[in-house]
Amino acid sequence: MALDALKGWTSAQKHAVAAAYLGWTLDAFDFFVLTFVMPDIAKQFDVNIPAIALALTLTLAVRPLGAFLFGRLADDYGRRPILILNILLYSLFGFATAFAPTLSVFLIARGLFGVAMGGIWGIGASLSMETVKPGARGFVSGLLQSGYPSGYLVASVAFGAVHAAFGWRGMFMVGLIPGILLALYIWLAVSESPVWQRPATVKAGKHVVHLVGVAVILSAMLAVLIRFGREEGLVYIVAAIVPLLIVAGVLTPFIRKHWKLAVYAILLMTGFNFFSHGTQDLYPTFLRVQHHFDDATVTFITVVLNVGAIVGGLFFASLSQSFGRRRTVILVALMALPVIYFWASAQTAAMLALGAFLMQICVQGAWGVVPVHLNELSPGHVRGTFAGTVYQLGNLIASINAVFQAELAESGKQFLGLQHYSLALAVVACFAALLIATMMFLGPEARNVEMGRAAPASE
């Protein structure tokens, strides 16, 4: 199945897929660095963990802005140059985080990183899916999405190798040089998507308007979240998120034109993002704070879970090529349900590692199908924008997860013997698995659809 998908690849196809995978891996690394050092940053700035969890919320909440802005640029100027720009920007903003003197500056740096991070998935997925042959899309989808747990795995190793010697600030410095080298590799070795066509005319003024709009919305969100989010929690976070959803729906032409598909895809991606972020983002904190494990044990468990994630993503994405996108995701989402209690309630390092391994097989097994499924459903002329934007709007809704889980963990509530972070992890995982299975059951499938040549993004 996977071996057949690897046959007969051209050099251009190999480089395109490698670029998309590595771009998403490095992006995920820069994101997950924070999840390992939240207790250290909370101590540095003399705040509690929910206040630092706001940085995760902020990073996720602003990603739709990057998906829209960079997606439009990629539809008009090509996937390759905008992918390079994206990688350089998120590497620079990730590096800048290390020098934040105050919590507010730290949050602003993570917000800017989130905008750059928002563009990378949609552009990389479009480049790879438009380049490879249809029969290889399932495997490539799983490979591309495995970049996310690969980045998490590298962050796990970096935590074990760097944290003790250089602290949390040193962790944020690691990604800069790899980012520059990756951008250079794409510039020298990667070809433009064979599907993308340069528009006859590109209205530069349109992109200025988009950029100004993104800057205004980003500034407003940063102001609300930083001013009120730390003290008032979810109420003000939702107050910042809801207007952005309204603006996105009203002002984005391709969402207005394809609103039924967009609403469906956003709800679907809301479930997917709760599934991943709800089982991953606070997991290192769960290991450090609730179980009091040392750096080596945390590294071991997170490496094991990410191996499971990579295996699950590659296997089930490849399976979807013959079994179907919808049926594969429904199967894996339902498989997660009996695993959740064991995963959240285990007490020893060995049992926690086993539970995390099984859980992430399910989580990334479902996620592995997402790149190909969204790109097959997307309208061709705005594929670079549509897939990335609906993905990140789902991320926007799910961005409340980190603060919600941190506050629930510290509330003292108990259910079925679960408490603290165990309860917070289990509640979100169960909700997300059921939502994903329901949405996939209700939704369409476009397996192996002919993507054709993308027309200019004139909307």
Question: Language-model segments: what does each one mean?
Answer:
Residues L34-T35, V214-L244, A248, T252-I310, ...:
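Extracytoplasmic gate region of multi-pass secondary transporters
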Residues L144-W187, A204-H210, A223-Y236:
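Helix-loop-helix hairpin linking two adjacent transmembrane segments in secondary transporters
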Residues L89, F93-A96, S104-L112, A350-L358:
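Paired small-residue
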Residues L65-L103, F323-R326:
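Conserved MFS/SLC helix-loop-helix module at the cytosolic interface between two early adjacent transmembrane helices
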Residues S320, R326-V370:
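C-terminal transmembrane helical hairpin of 12-TM major facilitator-type secondary transporters
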Residues T57-R72, G124-A125, V303-F315:
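Central cavity-lining transmembrane alpha-helices of secondary-active solute carriers
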Residues A109-S146:
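Cytoplasmic helix-loop-helix junction between adjacent transmembrane helices
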Residues M1-F31, F36:
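Cytosolic juxtamembrane N-terminal segment immediately preceding the first transmembrane helix
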